[in-house]
């Protein structure tokens, strides 16, 4: 998956399920729940050992950068997932108090007339050590996908199906013919545990979305995501007629 598709994968299957207010049930009647439980932090192997996910509002060029969140908490880079192990949630001061868990500075409001709630900010996958050429060269049979076209995920942010605009066959370590309408599906934990290669800094792109919605009344904010290209093994892929 190329970075412009990875940002959706991060957003939907890491970002939303790790929001602590959602885990505590606050979004149940609007946007759903989370397959993650409060007791999972510090023990759940969320992905393979190649998965390192950081919350970092201090990066100037990303969409959701700040020095303090809207509760006045200083913002720092924090690992949410290190070597695949789930460490901490996306939870601000109030959710931390309610749960007893250590979170991050992510209480954000879209305006003066909305309360701060737990939101993503800059949520990134840390680069690995392989170039795009090395990753492609290590794949016997697969497909390169880029540019999101469609998305569907259940209200616990667990089972998902995503489609891409661009697909290109990989055979014996080489890019081959183009396919159309490639899709893939999976279950969040299983999917991230099948992460088998992470691109280096040369594949890393800073992207994001300006319109992530959450809360009642609704709040729309900017969210930053940065990611290298990533390889996943044993994924259910369908569509993609040549």
Locate the predicted segments by residue:
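N-terminal small-residue-enriched
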Residues: 1-242
């Amino acid at each position: 998956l190329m970075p412009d598709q990875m940002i959706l994968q991060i957003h939907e299957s890491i970002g939303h399920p790790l929001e602590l207010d959602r885990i505590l049930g606050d979004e149940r009647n609007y946007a759903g729940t989370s397959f993650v439980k409060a007791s999972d932090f510090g023990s759940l192997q969320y992905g393979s050992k190649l998965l390192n996910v950081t919350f970092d509002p201090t990066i100037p060029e990303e969409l959701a950068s700040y020095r303090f969140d809207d509760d006045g908490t200083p913002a720092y880079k924090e690992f949410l997932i290190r070597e695949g192990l789930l460490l901490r949630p996306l939870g601000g001061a109030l959710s931390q108090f309610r749960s007893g868990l250590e979170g991050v500075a992510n209480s954000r409001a879209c305006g003066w007339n909305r309360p701060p709630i737990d939101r993503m900010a800059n949520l990134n996958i840390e680069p690995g050590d392989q170039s795009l050429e090395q990753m492609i060269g290590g794949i016997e049979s697969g497909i390169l996908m880029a540019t999101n076209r469609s998305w569907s995920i259940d209200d616990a942010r667990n089972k998902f199906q995503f489609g891409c605009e661009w697909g290109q066959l990989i055979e014996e370590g080489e890019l081959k013919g183009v396919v159309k309408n490639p899709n893939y599906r999976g279950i969040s934990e299983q999917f991230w545990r099948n992460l088998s290669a992470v691109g280096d800094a040369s594949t890393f792109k800073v992207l994001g979305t300006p319109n992530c919605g959450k809360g009642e009344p609704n709040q729309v904010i900017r969210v930053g995501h940065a990611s290298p290209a990533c390889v996943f093994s044993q994924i259910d892929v369908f569509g993609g007629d040549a």
